[in-house]
């Protein structure tokens, strides 16, 4: 009979002193997915918390689930706590979004688009423009809020001496575009 070997993953920290905790309002996996993060991106990011790949994969950050299953080894587990970095999660999520096919992106983005745009629109064209700029699907509605109603802006931002525009000519051009 062989004595089992136990391993322990390091705690995930909010910052250098505090653990990540749902009791303190920190996001759970389901909260992140509800906010528009892709499930695979969250899984990829969480896997990299407190673990790093070795060998030929040492510099790689984006993995498919099959790759993670293949290369994961307890040798890569760090002894120090891992700090949850929301900006890193956003960057990984943005990369996953960019790697989606246009059809996959449209399918995932449509519920967010439908919640923001209530006028007929070419969703395929819209998604082609959104995909390279999108980091989190949940931010799509605020990126599209101008489709149904022109938001109020400070008129001084429409003046441009070099292009000889005034607030009046800029407003005419914007209304013609919309």
Regions found by a protein language model. Give the residues of each.
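Small-residue-rich helix-loop
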Residues: 102-178
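Alpha-helical recognition segments enriched in aromatics with Gly/Pro capping
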Residues: 1-97
């Amino acid at each position: 009979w062989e004595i089992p070997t136990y391993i322990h993953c390091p705690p995930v920290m909010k910052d250098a002193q505090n653990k990540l905790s749902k009791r303190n309002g920190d996001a759970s996996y389901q909260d992140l997915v509800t906010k528009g993060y892709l499930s695979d991106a969250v899984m990829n990011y969480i896997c990299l918390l407190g673990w790093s790949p070795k060998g030929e994969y040492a510099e790689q950050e984006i993995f498919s689930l099959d790759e993670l299953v293949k290369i994961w080894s307890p040798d890569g587990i760090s002894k120090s706590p891992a700090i949850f970095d929301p900006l890193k999660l956003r960057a990984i999520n943005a990369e996953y979004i960019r790697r989606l096919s246009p059809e996959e992106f449209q399918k995932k983005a449509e519920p967010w688009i439908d919640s923001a745009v209530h006028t007929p629109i070419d969703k395929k064209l819209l998604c082609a423009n959104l995909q390279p700029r999108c980091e989190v699907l949940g931010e799509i509605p605020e990126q599209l809020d101008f489709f149904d109603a022109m938001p109020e802006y400070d008129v001084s931002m429409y003046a441009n001496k070099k292009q000889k525009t005034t607030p009046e000519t800029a407003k005419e051009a914007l209304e013609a575009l919309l």
